Amino acid sequence: MIQASVEVSKVYREEGGELLEALLACADSRCGATYPVLNGVPIVLKDMDSWWRQSKPSLSSVRSAAPGIRDFFDGLEARGAAGIVARSLLGTYVDFHYGKFVDAPRPPAPFSDAVNDSYWEKIVGMARPESGMRYGRSLDLGCSVGRFVFELARFSGLVVGIDLDFEKVSVAARLRRRRELVFERRELGKAFRCVEGAFDPPQNVLFLVGDALDPPFPAGSFDLVGALNLLDNVGVPLMLLGQMDALLRDGGTMLLGTPYEWRTEIADPAEWLETETVDAPSFLRRVLEGKELALTGFRFTVEEEHTEVPWILRGHARRWTLFLSHMIKARKAVS
């Protein structure tokens, strides 16, 4: 019965004429189903997704299987609940960074493209050095999918971007390598749309998976250190400021942008940079200037500040979230 209902689509490994690793396809073209053969055993199930969720913890054979077989099971993973969330979140951030460069439906009013365009123009304008000057080395902590790294590269000798999220860093590294902007946008529910666009990234960049609270660089390595939307996404925000201070050379530039979206699952309220009487933007400024938590030894001069810079994250076609970021540019004192 199996022989009558399926046919061999792709053979990856066989022995003595017996299929050990292969993909089988439903013989009826209207069906469209694909079934794997793993260790010589065909897996022919209607509800492959449910079976995979139950079996994957014990199915160690997949890890050593041919790439095509691993890709098949990766596809099952992506269609599951966790996979949908992960794909959606990744697409959300790629869209925020590169949405203006793709051919895709634009946001409905009042969520205009101009909002995010203005956000990037603002932060790039703040980062831009004085006329005719260039940074030697710049660093973007929590670089996500890389837009700010590429922007900094236009007026830096080298820019390093680090982030803990491997998938996000992979998007940025692939964009630099292939010069192709291709990603999935979630439309609704399980429906995703593949979108493409034109983006020519600078090549004087390096992307690493690393911890912003324990970065792998010696002190004083950078002329500019930035952290966008990261301060409220680390367990100890003050430690992030300390690392930025340490990584900057004397006279270097710090760039921060944050909507202060404090969450108890990330940082204990005792770590939040605010008090009951001093709001977060004022508190952060005073900390950098050495007027609060003076034992940190921070000695920065705030050169530019914007307290409510709007930006938008697209969750899917019917969910758009507006944030207001506090952006601050500060210069480290010279000893």
Where in this protein do the model-derived segments appear?
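Conserved SAM/SAH-binding beta-strand->alpha-helix loop
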Residues: 165
